[in-house]
């Protein structure tokens, strides 16, 4: 937890909505990623586990998210990541989506139009990189 943050830094904080996708109740990895992102200055909106694509997209809109992070531990729930990415595109949100979890691969992430993160440290690096790329557009 951040105990002190200047007003200027708080205003510049980027927002990331994170969730474990629908059907998946495994959230330890997501919780670690959320903690790491928070410690690196992101405002994390953690929706928890077993979250429907619609709820994730609604939260991204409501919180004016800069990024969305999705987690899945089971191959049977990875398809819900695709549902979320598709809904983000359908709604025209223009928000990058990061995906990760034990069963998620770079090839899968690419196939659904998302950005792959291998672990919590990589998630922080990727989030910063995606934010910087958007800033430079």
Describe each model-derived feature in a short phrase:
Residues 2-3:
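Short, small-residue-biased leader/transition segments that mark boundaries at the very start
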Residues 7-20:
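Glycine/charge-rich, flexible interdomain linkers and switch-proximal surface loops
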Residues 18-21, 70-72:
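Short glycine-centered, acidic/aromatic-flanked micro-motifs in structured strand/loop junctions
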Residues 20-22, 114-115:
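Acidic/polar, glycine-rich intrinsically disordered N-terminal extensions of enzymes
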Residues 30-40, 44-114, 119-128:
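Cofactor-cradling patches in redox/metallo enzymes
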Residues 126-137:
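A charged, well-structured terminal subsegment
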């Amino acid at each position: 937890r951040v105990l002190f943050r200047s007003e200027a830094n708080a205003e510049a904080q980027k927002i990331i909505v994170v969730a474990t996708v629908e059907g998946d109740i495994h959230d330890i990895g997501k919780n670690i990623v959320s903690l790491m992102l928070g410690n690196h200055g992101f405002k994390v909106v953690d929706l928890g586990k077993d979250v429907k694509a619609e709820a994730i997209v609604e939260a991204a809109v409501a919180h004016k998210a800069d990024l969305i992070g999705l987690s899945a531990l089971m191959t049977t729930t990875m398809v819900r990541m695709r549902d979320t990415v598709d809904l983000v595109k359908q709604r025209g949100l223009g928000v990058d989506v990061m995906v990760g979890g034990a069963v998620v691969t770079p090839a899968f992430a690419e196939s659904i139009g998302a950005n792959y993160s291998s672990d919590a440290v990589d998630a922080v690096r990727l989030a910063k990189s995606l934010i910087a790329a958007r800033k430079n557009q």
